[in-house]
Amino acid sequence: MKTIPKKTIWYPIQFILLIGLIAFLSFYKLDVKYVDPWDEARHGVNAYEMANGGSLIQSTYMRQADYYNLKPPLSMYGIMLGMAIFGNTVFALRFYAALSYVLLALCVGLFAKRYGKLESLLAVAFLAVNTTAFQAHMIRSGDADSLYVLLFTLAMICMMKIRENGRYSYACAFLFALAFLTKSYHAGLIAVIGGLFLLLTGELKKWKAKNWLLFLAAALLPIMLWAAARYRIDGMTFFQKMW
């Protein structure tokens, strides 16, 4: 009978324990802290009204067009998902943000394993002890930041794998679009880093017209579809204020 080496046993156990620790830190008493009266509360109202007879494209506050929260609606869909599962509660408001961080830790840990098991565990451990992320406006808050950081990180992971498989450039572009639909112009950082990477590594020289077409479609089509739908509602008003 074959025995499993101890090193093979310990890595998955330690990895699962670290992910479990992050899940505990993210979700434990998630609904205890008061709701921030600024962004968090407003995002909750936006999502609630969207889910209860409002527009899925235009965010509203007190059933009036909201030009204070000038973000595209993807993060509001995350809050709506929480409300659909857990009802209209504070836990539901923050659920998607906490889940995003757990998924972030899982993805980072699995990606880092290519460099070694110790590196994988250290990467997840760092995310567990990064106290700043557990404070206001991110993991334990109904704000867009946690989802944005997840999408940003996935885009960077895909970018680092482009030289292995060029199709990862399309995934990176699509994640840029999702990040834009979450935090608007914050996603520009992905474009800057990705553009420099493609330029400095010489990957752009390998691209043909088909590659450019697919890349631009992945990056721009989701944004353009949302923008067209939003334009039909209130013209250029939202975009002018957003700018």
Which positions does each model-derived feature cover?
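Membrane-interface transmembrane helices that cradle and orient dolichyl/undecaprenyl
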Residues: K2, R114, T153-S169
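Extracytosolic helix-loop segments that constitute the early lumenal/periplasmic catalytic or substrate-binding loops
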Residues: F24-K29, H43-Y67, L74
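Short acidic/glycine- and proline-prone juxtamembrane loop motifs at membrane-interface regions
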Residues: H137-L147
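Loop-to-helix entry region of an early transmembrane alpha helix in multi-pass inner-membrane enzymes
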Residues: P73-Y77, F86-L103, M138
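Transmembrane-helix motifs of polytopic, lipid-linked glycan transferases
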Residues: F95-K117, L154
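Transmembrane-lumen/periplasm boundary regions of multi-pass, lipid-linked membrane glycan transferases
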Residues: H43-E49, I162, L178, T182, ...
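Membrane-interface alpha helices of multi-pass inner-membrane proteins
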Residues: C158, Y168-K183
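Transmembrane-helix signature of polytopic, membrane-embedded enzymes
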Residues: L18, V108-N130
